[in-house]
Structures are given as C-alpha cells and as structure tokens.
Amino acid sequence: MSKPIRLFISSSPDLVAEREAVGQAVAGLPIAPGWEIKHTPRAGEEALEAQAFVEHCDLLLVVLGADFAAPMGLEWQGAVNAGKPVLAYCKQVLHSPAAQAALRRTQVAWTEFRFAQQLKAQVTRGLAQAVLDQGERLGLRMEDVEGLLALVKPEEQKERKPAGPDRREGAGRGGVILEGRA
C-alpha cells in the first residue's frame, strides 16, 4: 500500500472560505493513497512542526490573499530549498506591500481567482495534474491515474478542439506512393 500524499497548504490568514474550498477540492480527488495535510499555523500555534512537515512534503500549495503574512515566507523558502513542487494561487484583491513583493520575486506562475468556488475548480485541476506528474514516485495505481485523468482531460479537450470539420479523406481505391530521394 502507498503512503499518503503529504500536502502542505500555506495561506494568508484572511482566507477562511478559500481554505475550506481547497479542503473540498483535495477531498474530491479520487486517489487511494489518501492525504496527510498540514496548514500554516494560526497565530499562537507552534510553527516548527509545520516547517519540518514542509521540508518533507510532496507538494506545497500556496493561496495568497491580501497579505503574505508570517510564517508564509519561511514555508515558501523551506519548500523551494527542498525542491518541492509548488502550486500557487492568488486572490484578485488589493495586496499589501509584502504580498506585492512576494508576487514579484517568486519564480512561479500564479493562478488568479476571485471566488472560493473558482479556486476549488482550479485547485482540483491543478492538484490532479501535479499528482499525475509525480504519479510513479507517489505510488499511484492505474485506478488513481484514470480518475485523475478524467478531471484533467476535459480541460485539455477544450483546448484541442479543431476549428472546423475534418476534411481529410483517404485515397479511395487507388493511390500513388512516391519514394523520396535526396
């Protein structure tokens, strides 16, 4: 049996509804190994345990709201230093100077969202793809892969729709084969 996938969710303190949406997205992913999840500690909670988890997690998921508040910077740096894959989401709100600086200096593509439900859909697809990308290392079974592909494929199929009808035709009953010579 595979070990649970270790996910650390680093988030701004102002994102209560968004953290709930992320939890729903994670719970909805059809994978057998399950999850071990830790979050950014709240004010007054011990940060050392969370930081140790970050360094050994499989994925870091960052959700940025109005502020890039402590200890988000330590969580980010710990994951980057350990070479962990990062999924980054940014709420379209007025950002503090610290959040603006984080958006500028981090070397990651931020996915923007406006509402918790939009974030849930984005995290479902993004996390499904991130888990698929590491499927062998995470010990996914074929059933896990099929379930995750079903979540990712609809988006891929929309992107690849042909512009018009397919007008390719065969040679019918005849054909010519040309041998290429240089």
Model feature map: region roles:
Residues 1-59, 82, 146-182:
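Conserved N-terminal substructure of TIR/SEFIR domains
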